[in-house]
Amino acid sequence: FKSLKERKIINLKSPIILICSKNLLIKQMEKLNYRFSIQILNRKNIKKKYLNNKKINLIDVNFNFKKPFDKISKKSKTYIEECVNVALNLIKSGNFKTLINGPISKTHFLQKRMPGMTEYFAKKTNSEGNEVMLIFNKDLAVSPITTHLHLKKIFKKITKRNIVKHVEII
């Protein structure tokens, strides 16, 4: 919400699609006293021409919750998995190229099967070895040469070839 509020949703250059529970989003907006217009999208037929850059474009994923802000637990794993799968299907459709994920509990979602979401998305999109992370704010953008690695393994991955490949991907 903070990013949306700071950028003033009415001035977005590109539309944003949120994939989450409509009811949860509304309850969280009420709690934070935010007001944004929401446009519900049909997840079966999403095309760029249907998107509105003056509203939150929302793909609704059902989630039963008690409190709008609660600790992440195992019960949210299925919900997160469905949201991620919807996002991956949008990317695989070829209509969308960019995916920005919010905070996801690696402990509950990945359950130590992978080091991070970057590697998870790379595996699901058959692009292992070509994954990059971009960390940015309004003043700075950084893209680490490696993704989630133990410190002792990082030095082996920082080579001229890997740096060039990384820059080409970005």
Which residues make up each language-model segment?
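Anion-binding alpha/beta catalytic cores of soluble intermediary-metabolism enzymes, centered on
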Residues: 1-170
